[in-house]
Structure formats: structure tokens, C-alpha cells
């Protein structure tokens, strides 16, 4: 990629960085159901989500912001419908994935996720009781499964406790009285550039870009197989191409890369 031809860059001369959001964050990525489905299928290792497709996902983030406030605006909440092996919908199972976007370690993330869960379950209860009065008081009433996931872009190893109970005093002595769950961390750095390149899906290129935090990272990114980057970018829908450009531009600006050089780097993946 370092020797990308001038012709490729000229083809992409119409790209104007100032037209794009410079502070793109991960929510832009996970608002896209195609990228989200690839992430859930290929990077979480959760059997229940192994066959999730874009059409099985509904973004319900805005529904809960009225309850949770502006501090949660960067997070996404998805409702996922589970299908049978033959592709038919078995039923509308409410599997809500909470994907946090942390560039550094948040040691209180388990408690933050619990707040999400309580709001989601409370809203679900209210909705079901409107449909059928008193339904939540019945023995067979069940609340929806919530799968909490942290998408971590930072360089440091994630060292926060993965269980809610570990944030509460007397967690061992009084364990049976303490609510608990485990959240999953998917770190972009748990994969090498080679491993991501081999996955060859659109989310893998997102994660390759998200790994760029230093000039050394940028240099390593530009060594990634040009064939992989070109084919992944070239076959991506236009809305995903725009996401690539936005997140890459945002990262290059954080590295204080000059505008002209940043445009050329984007041209290396965007010259189609």
C-alpha cells in the first residue's frame, strides 16, 4: 500500500475530508447493521448469534436515551431476532447487545451496563403490561436476554473486572445476595493484522483501522495486503465506504497527520 500508484489517488481526488465528520466514533460503526451482524457472528464467539444477519437486527438505541441521558449517546443497543437453521424466524427473542466504545479502560463499566439492563427490562415490563395487564406478575413471564459486550480500541490490556459482583463489597462472603453477570470484551488488539486480514470481511477492515493510534500503527496498517484492503473496500456498500473514510480521517487527525498526507492515505484505500 505504501507504493500505491498516483493514478489511484487521482481517481479519488474528489474526496474532500472537510466534508466528513472528523470526530467519528464507534457508534457510527455499530449503527450499521451489516457491520454489526459481522461483528456478532465472527468476533464474539457466542453460538446464539452465529447466524445473525443484518435483517435480524433492529437498532433501538434512541428509544432508551430518554431514560439514560446524553452521557450514553455514544453507545448502541440492538434488538436481535433469532432464526431457525432453515432461516425462518422461530420467534422474536429479545436479545439486546450493548456495545460500549471505550478507547481507555473504564473500571466501572459493569455498573454502567447494569443501568442499561435495568432500564431495558423495566421498559420491556411496561410494554408487556400494556399489551396484557398484569402479565409481568405471572409465573411464566420472562425478561429478555441481554448480552453486554465492550468493544475496546485501546492499546492497554483490559484489566477491569468482567463480573458485576467484583465491584461490590463482600462479594465472596455474601455472594448469594449479590446480582451478577459477566460482560465480554472484544479488543481490536486481540487480533494481529494478519488474522484480521484473513477474515476478509468488512468489519475486519474497520478493526484494522481502529488499531491505528500511533505512527507505528499507521506504518503497520499500510503494510497490510493491498489486495485484501482493495477487495474489501471495493466490494463494500457506499455507506460502509463512508464509514471507513470517516474513522480513518478521525484517527489521522488525532495523530496530527497533515491534511494532504491524510488525504493520500485515504486515497490508498479509497481510490475506486
Summary of predicted features, one role per range:
Residues 1-272:
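Elongated, amphipathic alpha-helical interaction scaffolds
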